[in-house]
Curated annotation (Swiss-Prot):
It comes from Bacillus subtilis (strain 168). The lineage of its organism: Bacteria, Bacillati, Bacillota, Bacilli, Bacillales. GO terms for cellular component: membrane; plasma membrane. The gene is glcP. Belongs to the major facilitator superfamily. It is found in: Cell membrane. The chain crosses the membrane at residues 11-31, 43-63, 78-98, 99-119, 132-152, 156-176, 212-232, 247-267, 278-298, 306-326, 336-356, 360-380. The keyword Transmembrane helix applies. Keywords: Cell membrane, Membrane, Sugar transport, Transmembrane, Transmembrane helix, Transport. This is Glucose/mannose transporter GlcP.
Length: 401
């Protein structure tokens, strides 16, 4: 049952990757079909990530009350219902509602699968890294599908494809649960919930609360860069008069992330995590500045790939480092880290959407670069952080692998 659920986790994370990039990949078609601006696209992205944040925050409560299995079933059901209604209406405002519901389902799937892996597998870091690769493959495959088969006359077909995939996955999941009915019925895996002890711990320890604040802000800014760069990349390319590569550029970005995460999985045991964050964020600054002044399509695609490669390991490494440095209440720290990332993706989308309407790509890239500079500053602060435990961060990290 455990192994089977984990294998379904691959499909669930693949789905999350698709939902994560769906709006951004369809941006050129949505702009033309509904005669909208990038500000309007920002609204969809905001509601999508608000839904994702809601799923991240509510999923632990659902798991506690109904178990991991029922929570996953509910998430799939909500997503299928949302997509079913889309068959009946292509209204702009319903697309916003659907984005929220799909985001909620994706947030619930990611949080629930992650909680299940952490609760049931000793090698949870390795298991999670494999799931993250499937997330990247999902985010990669969707823009490839759109670039190959979709035009302005059938822009809605990708949502039909998502529905078909989810329906097959849902049926397979129900069959799997029916064959393991007793185990699923008696399952009582629960996550650890924040309590007064966690609150008092951070309030009473100024150093720990400061460290937590650094990591939460880091997650906010990082997700603001990654998610919005990916979602607005087609619009960025169009603004630079490279519409012919606007869709395929998203795939180059996610190929870079996938390769980067695979490489990080191989070398993570030997990494100095704080040095890695500082190095990656510094590389990101250089690449973003260079990207701002590149107009050649080949060089732009290469730059997009390198940006994806440079940031591939930042999120999982920062999350792992946060749990190592702060030491206690790891579940609470993890939930807060992911929630802050979701919030960053939602809020910063408005800023990026506004900047793209100013008809100068330098403003948009300047915003991304400024956030990357702040990430470097936070990385320096993290680098200087010393734990009370004499065991080195690197030795502790090796024990978490």
């Amino acid at each position: 049952m455990l192994r089977g659920t984990y294998l379904f986790g691959y499909a669930f994370f693949f789905t999350v990757g698709i939902i994560h990039i769906s709006t951004g990949s369809l941006t050129p078609f949505l702009l033309e079909a509904f005669n909208k601006t990038t500000d309007d696209i920002s609204v969809i992205i905001f509601f999508q990530f608000t839904g994702f944040l809601s799923g991240v925050l509510i999923a632990p409560l659902m798991i506690k009350k109904y178990s991991h299995f029922r929570t996953l079933t509910l998430a799939l059901t909500i997503m299928l219902v949302a997509l079913s209604i889309f068959f009946l209406t292509k209204d702009w405002y319903y697309i916003i509602v659907m984005a929220f519901l799909l985001g909620y389902g994706a947030g619930t799937l990611e949080t629930t699968v992650g909680s299940f892996v952490i609760a049931n597998f000793e090698s949870n870091a390795e298991k999670m890294s494999k799931l993250e690769v499937l997330f990247g493959l999902g985010a990669l495959s969707f823009p490839l599908l759109i670039n190959s088969f979709i035009d302005i006359n059938n822009w809605f077909l990708p949502y039909y494809c998502i529905f078909t995939f989810l329906f097959v996955l849902f049926v397979g999941w129900l069959i799997f649960l029916s064959k393991n009915r007793e185990y699923a019925k008696n399952a009582n895996q629960q996550v650890t919930f924040p309590d007064g002890g966690a609150f008092q711990y951070f309030i009473g320890d100024r150093k720990k609360s400061k460290q937590l604040g650094f990591f939460v802000f880091f997650a906010f800014l990082y997700a603001g860069i990654e998610t919005n760069f990916a979602n607005f990349l087609p619009s960025i390319m169009i603004n630079q008069d490279n519409e012919q590569i606007s869709l395929i550029s998203v795939s180059f970005f996610w190929v870079g992330i996938i390769i980067g995460r695979i490489l990080i999985g191989f070398v993570s045991r030997r990494l100095d995590f704080s040095k890695y964050l500082l190095f990656s964020c510094s590389c990101l600054i250089v690449l973003l500045i260079a990207f701002s002044y590149i107009s050649n399509p080949i060089l732009q695609l290469s730059g997009t790939f390198l940006i994806g490669l440079s940031i591939a390991g930042i999120f999982p490494i920062a999350l792992t480092l946060a749990s190592i440095i702060i030491q206690k209440y790891v579940d609470e720290v993890t939930s807060l880290f992911i929630a802050s990332a979701s919030f960053g993706g939602a809020i910063i989308s408005f800023l990026i959407g506004w900047s793209l309407n100013q008809d100068t790509i330098l403003l948009t890239m300047g915003i991304f670069t400024t956030m990357a500079v702040i990430l470097v500053g936070i990385s320096v602060k993290i680098r200087r952080t010393k734990t009370e435990d004499p065991i080195s961060l690197e030795n502790k990290a090796s024990k978490t692998q």
